From Swiss-Prot:
GO terms for molecular function: aminoacyl-tRNA deacylase activity; ATP binding; proline-tRNA ligase activity. It comes from Salmonella paratyphi C (strain RKS4594). This is Proline--tRNA ligase. Gene3D superfamilies: Anticodon-binding domain, Bira Bifunctional Protein, Domain 2, YbaK/aminoacyl-tRNA synthetase-associated domain. The gene is proS. InterPro entries: aa-tRNA-synt_IIb, aa-tRNA-synth_II, aa-tRNA-synth_II/BPL/LPL, Anticodon-bd, Anticodon-bd_dom_sf, Pro-tRNA-ligase_IIa, Pro-tRNA-synth_IIa_bac-type, Pro-tRNA-Synthase_IIa_type1. One of its GO terms (cellular component) is cytosol. One of its GO terms (biological process) is prolyl-tRNA aminoacylation. It is an enzyme of class 6 (ligase). Catalyzes the attachment of proline to tRNA(Pro) in a two-step reaction: proline is first activated by ATP to form Pro-AMP and then transferred to the acceptor end of tRNA(Pro). As ProRS can inadvertently accommodate and process non-cognate amino acids such as alanine and cysteine, to avoid such errors it has two additional distinct editing activities against alanine. One activity is designated as 'pretransfer' editing and involves the tRNA(Pro)-independent hydrolysis of activated Ala-AMP. The keyword Cytoplasm applies. It catalyses: tRNA(Pro) + L-proline + ATP = L-prolyl-tRNA(Pro) + AMP + diphosphate.
Length: 572
């Protein structure tokens, strides 16, 4: 490709509304342009990267035995009503009616459509297992689209759905998809972790997320410094303290704390170690509970894990924090003065809190706290559960090493769905025993557009994008200096351009009448891995300057050797 016949569209300045580096660089490198909130046009450079990501995904899905299909973006509402998600899904589901007043949705996902297809096409266990995939546009009406294509409303996704007559069969496919995803992200040159995850609104049993490590990530991922253990922080178990609870050394004392409504204020004003404080959070109780509220207690320096808390039998789902009005109606004190002593509602404490002694907590009286509280002396030990987020340095749940925490961008997610959708849509086949058998499902997603942004978040420097070779828009950039004034520069550039293309190498030759500084800046911004610079001065010695984008290393290579050198560097 020649720049004179190409839409380069690079920008010198960073757009003001671009928050994260991937959004900034995708705009500056001429990869995307915003059409409306959360909607982007992919320009040629961006589309080349997107297609490479898509091709790697497709190759590995085919290698894993999945079958490609294509399902409509527009879906009839009756399928969503049949599955129950018409009512469950929030405003992210874009609903509309056609000219005949028939309701439809723009698909955010395709569980209903594929299950409908299978229930009409399959009739016998002999046809299973099957794993269908597509690479298709999705639409989710995000309340606040941000970070460019990282969280856009319209996006490209690879979604796959497998169907089985046994859990063993599902597990085999699940393991195959796990391995395929690992190959996909490895081939793309990404630093990623596969982590245990919560199944969330999708439902089902087992679940793993594939997270690309990046400081801009929205998820905290946890992994052992010794073993292969890794999990989303939502799911990571906080191990109970291994040392026994220390004996009481203080008497419980009621203390006036009128200006201490938070743990931070309590610690600062009374010079308390934060590890000796407890915070109390009140949430709505489950419908079948005798109480309207439940008290959850975590250590002052720990954070409540809302996913864990929501799964407790006494707690309402979704987790809902009580308002101050609701708290005062039950406790007669504000949220800054709550604690376990004389608490009139059910109390659940974290494992770490259960191991505490001589601690401070609210007295359930405005402006007062108890200091020197001890379990079983001042208040009975209540229900104990793992309800906090782990912190760096905690022991790994598998007993090997300690935990590290890094930020991650979720680019893939696999689920064992079980029978949630097949039961709702009555998808069954005749089993081996002749009886009707509801199908067991798995689903497996990759955010194809998000992968592009995540790759940039991991691969950039002060000059621009530093693409992994496998997904770069071009493999080689040819920069002929003053080619319009030097016949030998132009002649060699054209010769190398033809020879490299004949070797199947993707080349961008900058044949613009531009200053060298502009040409260098654009190629580094775009992030092409290999650059060759052809200039009269080096040609006097029969040399070409070669530069590898990732290392920045430059070297002089003889003109007769450069093609073989590049072929070897690119193809191995």
């Amino acid at each position: 490709m020649r720049t004179s016949q190409y839409l380069l569209s690079t920008l010198k300045e960073t757009p003001a509304d671009a928050e994260v580096i991937s959004h900034q660089l995708m705009l500056r490198a001429g990869m995307i342009r915003k059409l409306a909130s959360g909607l982007y046009t992919w320009l040629p450079t961006g589309l080349r990267v997107l297609k490479k990501v898509e091709n790697i995904v497709r190759e590995e899905m085919n290698n894993a035995g999945a079958i490609e299909v294509s399902m409509p973006v527009v879906q009839p509402a009756d399928l969503w009503q049949e599955s129950g998600r018409w009512e469950q899904y929030g405003p992210e589901l874009l609903r509309f009616v056609d000219r005949g007043e028939r309701p439809f949705v723009l698909g955010p996902t395709h569980e209903e459509v594929i299950t409908d297809l299978v229930r009409n096409e399959l009739s016998s266990y002999k046809q299973l297992p099957l794993n269908f995939f597509q690479i298709q546009t999705k639409f989710r009406d995000e309340v606040r689209p941000r970070f460019g294509v990282m969280r856009s409303r319209e996006f490209l996704m690879k979604d796959a759905y497998s169907f089985h007559t046994s859990q063993e069969s599902l597990q085999e496919t699940y393991d195959a998809m796990y391995a395929a995803y690992s190959r996909i992200f490895s081939r793309m040159g990404l630093d990623f972790r596969a982590v245990q995850a919560d199944t969330g609104s999708i439902g089902g049993n087992a679940s793993h997320e594939f997270q690309v490590l990046a400081q801009s990530g929205e998820d905290d991922i946890v992994f052992s410094d010794v073993s292969d253990y890794a999990a989303n922080i939502e799911l990571a178990e906080a191990i109970a303290p291994q040392t026994p609870r220390a004996a009481a050394t203080q008497e419980m004392t009621l203390v006036d704390t009128p200006n201490a409504k938070t743990i931070a204020e309590l610690v600062e004003q009374f010079n308390l170690p934060i590890e000796k404080t407890v915070k109390t959070l009140l949430v709505k109780a489950a419908k079948d509970s005798k109480s309207t509220l439940v008290a959850l207690l975590v250590r002052g320096d720990h954070e409540l894990n809302e996913v864990k808390a929501e799964k407790l039998p006494h707690v309402a789902s979704p987790l809902t924090f009580a308002t101050e009005e609701e708290i005062r109606a039950v406790i007669n004190a504000g949220p800054g003065s709550l604690g376990p002593v004389n608490m009139p509602i059910p109390v659940i404490i974290d494992r770490t809190v259960a191991a505490m002694s001589d601690f401070a907590a609210g007295a359930n009286i405005d402006g007062k706290h108890y200091f020197g509280i001890n379990w079983d002396r001042d208040v009975a030990t209540p229900v104990v559960a793992d309800i906090r987020n782990v912190v760096a340095g905690d022991p790994s749940p598998d007993g090997e090493g300690t935990l590290l925490i890094k930020r991650g961008i979720e680019v893939g997610h696999i689920f064992q769905l079980g029978t949630k959708y097949s039961e709702a849509l009555k998808a069954s086949v005749q089993g081996e025993d002749g009886r009707n058998q509801i199908l067991t499902m798995g689903c497996y997603g990759i955010g194809v557009t998000r992968v592009v942004a995540a790759a940039i978040e991991q691969n950039f420097d002060e000059r621009g994008i530093v693409w992994p070779d496998a997904i770069a828009p071009f493999q080689v950039a040819i920069l002929p200096m003053n080619m319009h004034k030097s016949f030998r520069v132009q002649e060699l550039a054209e010769k190398l351009y033809s020879e490299l293309r004949a070797q199947g190498i993707e080349v961008l030759m900058d044949d613009r009448k531009e200053r060298p500084g502009v040409m260098f800046a654009d190629m580094e911004l775009i992030g092409i891995p290999h650059t060759i610079v052809i200039g009269d001065r080096n040609l006097d010695n029969d040399d070409i300057e070669y530069k590898y984008r990732r290392s920045g290393k430059k070297s002089l290579i003889k003109t007769g050797d450069i093609v073989d050198y590049l072929v070897k560097a690119i193809k191995g």
